[in-house]
Each structure stands twice: as structure tokens, then as C-alpha cells.
């Protein structure tokens, strides 16, 4: 007797079975075991018929929620860029996007970090907001922190909010040295090298993503690490964004022959590959191209962004 004829003591064809199973499962909230007992089928048969119902189109799930668009974007971006994790925050008018991104990233880290694990942190407003929101969790779970670059000042707005007992390794050097020679000397200092090696061994990392078209709103410019003239020149060379001060083009390739790259003290972007989870935190439609480039370059494998930015990213990759 085939699956498409009468297949049980109830005299139901397969399509009717699927319909009844779907109704019991989704409408009445019965478990697959309860359905199998009610219809005289094995639990495995119930599971297979549910799956067949989805594949055939008999079962269609509709989510009526303001989060539906976010979930669709998450699924599309996760599949397109092979992301480990992604969170798209729903659009809220007049909301502080930086604050919301920090909260979203903090939640992602709280779900993934285990007690006493090591978290590497890049500089930037979004990452520091994340640390503020994580402060209680960091203390309770004894999470250890390490900075990904030099520069004490850019980190203090976040690290300064932590309990004094928290374990924090800060790179004892500036983010950018005054020359390539001085940068090389500092990188070779044992105290600096030890922190860099510790950062490479982190269980997870969180980084901000800057966009060249942010102009005077870019964190690296506001912090005084590049001048407006340098920003213009870097943009003319094809840069669309940066992570940790390293600028890359739309394909995620590092822009060659840029002075700042030789003067930075911290992990290079290709060194992030040793860290299992690298979360990029960035929002605002002007950052869409930079976020795409960061994912194409495989510098991040997880993302926290907002709904409008995710929509812009989808629009750009579908062109």
C-alpha cells in the first residue's frame, strides 16, 4: 500500500495525514509523541510527514511580528556570508542606534561565552557600549579581557566601567606610533608581544567596523589617529572601511602602501582568523558597504546590525 493511498486504520490518504498532523502540532500544540498515539503512527512517521508537508507546500508557516523582517534578513545574510551568528535589530524611530547595537552585541556574547573564557576587544563606540552592558556578566562569569590594539584612551570608556577585580590585559603602547621604526620597536617589546599573543588566543572577539564615507564621524578620525587629509587619500585608493585601523576595499582586500598600516600597534586583520568567533558590531546605512567588505574579507564571522542597514546590505549584494 503506497503512501498516497489509505495508509492507516483511520483510512486517511497521506495529504490528509499531513493536514491533521500539522493542525495538531501547530494549532493544538500537541507533541509529536502525542500525535503518533492519536493517529496510530510511529513518531518517526509523524516527523517525516511534517517535513514532507513543509517541502510540498501543504504546511506554510507565517510569522506575524515586527521581527519577521529581521529574521528574514538574518537568514539571508547568514547563508550568503556563511556567518556563525547574526542579530538584526528591528528598526525603532528616534532610537540611539549605538546603544541598541551595544545591547544586541552584549546579548550575543552572553549567550556564547562560558565562565573564565577570554574576550578580545577592539576600540570604537559600539564595542565600548557593549562592554558597559556586559560589566555585570563579565564579573559574574569571570570573563577575562584583552585589547586587540594599542591605545589606552579609546578603551577606557568601556573598561573603566568594569569591576576593579576584572582581569584585563591592555596593550602597553599607543594605537599608532609616530613612525614605522618606532612601531616596529614597540611591537618587539616583550610586554606588547605578550598581550598580542594573548589576544590571538582569545575565545571570542568583538570589533567595530568603520566606513570611509562616515567622514568626520569616523571613530578613527574623531580619536585623532588619522587626519582628514589622510582619510581623503585613503578613500581615493579605494578603501571603503576599516577594522582596528586597517583599511580595506570593497572586496575585503587590505589597501597597500598606506602609511598608517606600518605605524599601527596591534593585531593585523589576518591574525583574527585564529579566534573562533569574531563579532562585527556596526549600524547605519552608510556602513553597509564596509560591513559587506568585512564579511567578504572573512575578518568577522558574526554580525550585529540594525534592520535598515541589513536591508541596504541585501540590496547591495543583489545588484
Swiss-Prot record:
InterPro entries: NagB/RpiA_transferase-like, SorC_transcr_regulators, Sugar-bd_dom_put, WH-like_DNA-bd_sf. The keyword Ribosomal protein does not apply. It comes from the Bacteria. Gene3D superfamilies: 3.40.50.1360, Winged helix-like DNA-binding domain superfamily/Winged helix DNA-binding domain. Keywords: Cytoplasm, DNA-binding, Repressor, Transcription, Transcription regulation. The keyword Acyltransferase does not apply. Transcriptional regulator that represses the expression of the lsr operon in the absence of the quorum-sensing signaling molecule autoinducer 2 (AI-2). It also represses the expression of the lsrRK operon. Acts by binding to the intergenic region between the lsr operon and lsrR. In the presence of phosphorylated autoinducer-2 (phospho-AI-2), LsrR is inactivated, leading to the transcription of the genes. This is Transcriptional regulator LsrR. It comes from Salmonella paratyphi B (strain ATCC BAA-1250 / SPB7). The lineage of its organism: Bacteria, Pseudomonadati, Pseudomonadota, Gammaproteobacteria, Enterobacterales. The gene is lsrR.
